[in-house]
Amino acid sequence: MTFILQMYRFICAIFFLAILQGCSWFATRTPEDPSNSGLGFKPPTTPDLVITNLQNAFTDNNAENYILCFTDTLINKNLQFQFTPSGEANARYASLFANWNINNERAAFLSMVSRLEQNSRLLLTLSNSRFDILLPDSAVYVSDYSISVPTVVTAFEKNYVGSMRLTISQIGNGLWGISRWTDSRNPGIDSTLSTWSILKGQYSN
């Protein structure tokens, strides 16, 4: 009888410990850090990785990774980012683009992401891409682009097309970034669609 009683107590103790351990199964789960999801940002040790990061920032809807694609004057004060908009965008948003800088880039991107349809993603597609110039400290990248923006703003377009010319420069520490950006309309692409410059202007107002 004593043996049976001891076994009963032992089994009860094991059962009680199992219940205590099981309580952790129902504990609130720590939310996953959003920065750990998506394609992420690769150290831009070459000009082509800058382009890869630019596309990934769109796919991930990640404004900070987008900004990391540009030159940083905190690292190299001689590399002030410059943006030249397409002709129609400059006519429409002349005062805005007169003093365009990295802060404007961030604000426009954040505004765009905040107005996306729920659970949707931006898409940047590049075509006819090439490096026109490749030097030890700079490169010039030319490409046509199309951008898909599934926005909830009915007054804004959802598709943009054009051509861009990017000067990608070494910013220090073996890293590269976009120092100059010239946007333009591509006459060979659907002229009814607006350029990237228009997109930036729309989401800055």
Predicted regions mapped to residue ranges:
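Sec-dependent bacterial lipoprotein signal peptides
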Residues: 1-24
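Short, well-ordered alpha-helical segments enriched in acidic and aromatic residues
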Residues: 62-86
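Sec-exported extracytoplasmic/periplasmic mature domains
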Residues: 59, 71-75, 110-118
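Extracytoplasmic/secreted proteins, especially bacterial periplasmic and envelope-associated proteins
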Residues: 46-49, 53, 65, 100, ...
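A solvent-exposed, charged loop/short amphipathic helix patch at secondary-structure junctions
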Residues: 30-37, 82-93
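Surface-exposed, charged secondary-structure patches
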Residues: 88-157
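Short beta-strand edge/turn micro-motifs at domain boundaries
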Residues: 24-37, 138-140, 146-205
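Short, low-complexity N-terminal intrinsically disordered segments enriched in polar/charged residues
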Residues: 23-60, 68
